[in-house]
Amino acid sequence: MTATTTAQPSGPVPPASPTAARRLLLVHAHPDDEVITTGATMAAYAAEGAHVTLVTCTAGEEGEVLVPELAHLAADREDRLAEIRVVELANAMTALGVADHRFLGGVGCYRDSGMMGTPANDKPHAFWRADLDEAAAHLVKVVREIRPQVLVTYDENGGYGHPDHIQAHRVAMRAAELAADPAFAPEHGAVWDVAKIYWTAMPESVLAEGIQALKEAGDTSGFIAVESVEDLSFGTDDALVTTTIDGTAYMENKREGMRAYPTQISMGQGFFALSNSIGMEFMAHEFYQLVKGAAEGSDTGLEKDLFAGLGIADGTAAGVSQG
């Protein structure tokens, strides 16, 4: 995958009324977040015939640029990185087999806020500064159109404390609440109550195994190996993890999706790194914490299906429409 591409950034036009029995909505902060934490999940459900919708809240304008010949596009220079990241996202969606992708409020409605405490937090249209209900209203339109039984977003800390991730969490949770409220914006469509809500998770035990694997791998082309989980800004207590999706059959889709982001992700043999150069192991399994709905465990104690317990194998909808 090279840094230049001819893919069209607008992406395919999403269907107005999905007819798939299973409908999954994911809300992420920036292009590349979706493939790193949920790529195998998205590919798996898309391949199985579920309607998968991705809503990305910003175009990642403040991201660092790992491709030297594109460094001039960075926010502190020409400020045109969004042009590339939108195209990278379109290519990643092709790799994952996902046709329905939207930007919250449309491309450019909200800007990447940068890391916490930086001047980018206060730029015009920074997502971190967005009015919560106004931003949530954009997502309510999507929820009532798609009628997802399952919603995936981040935990209260946004996974690792990035302001856009925290805001994505707030907007997603507020939108789920408002979409079920008959008094809120009836012009946005019939009321819909999402049956199950998950937050992405990375069990501390799995992180520890990945750190050890990187150490044992030796030279990994400049990737930094941290000493312990405590050195990372993220990680979920294993006791909070309720669900795991086995993405083994879709790892190549996930890898190809990650290769679609040359400006953001450095790829290695079995490992990858972002701009901080900290090596992370490719994960065949992706993990979640169920925060709304009832978990349906297995002999391992973890759910194996985001739609478990919803009774939609026969094609009946499990969400609640009140319109």
Swiss-Prot record:
The protein's required cofactors: Zn(2+)
Residue positions binding Zn(2+): 30, 33, 165
A GO molecular-function descriptor: zinc ion binding
Name under which the protein is recorded: 1D-myo-inositol 2-acetamido-2-deoxy-alpha-D-glucopyranoside deacetylase 1
Cofactor descriptive note: Binds 1 zinc ion per subunit.
Pfam families: PIG-L
Keywords of this entry: Hydrolase, Metal-binding, Zinc
SUPFAM superfamilies: LmbE-like
Catalytic activity: 1D-myo-inositol 2-acetamido-2-deoxy-alpha-D-glucopyranoside + H2O = 1D-myo-inositol 2-amino-2-deoxy-alpha-D-glucopyranoside + acetate
UniProt organism field: Catenulispora acidiphila (strain DSM 44928 / JCM 14897 / NBRC 102108 / NRRL B-24433 / ID139908)
GO biological process terms, semicolon-separated: mycothiol biosynthetic process
NCBIfam families xrefs: mycothiol_MshB (TIGR03445)
The enzyme's E.C. designation: 3.5.1.103
Gene it is expressed from: mshB1
Gene3D superfamilies on file: LmbE-like (3.40.50.10320)
Family, similarity comment: Belongs to the MshB deacetylase family.
Function: Catalyzes the deacetylation of 1D-myo-inositol 2-acetamido-2-deoxy-alpha-D-glucopyranoside (GlcNAc-Ins) in the mycothiol biosynthesis pathway.
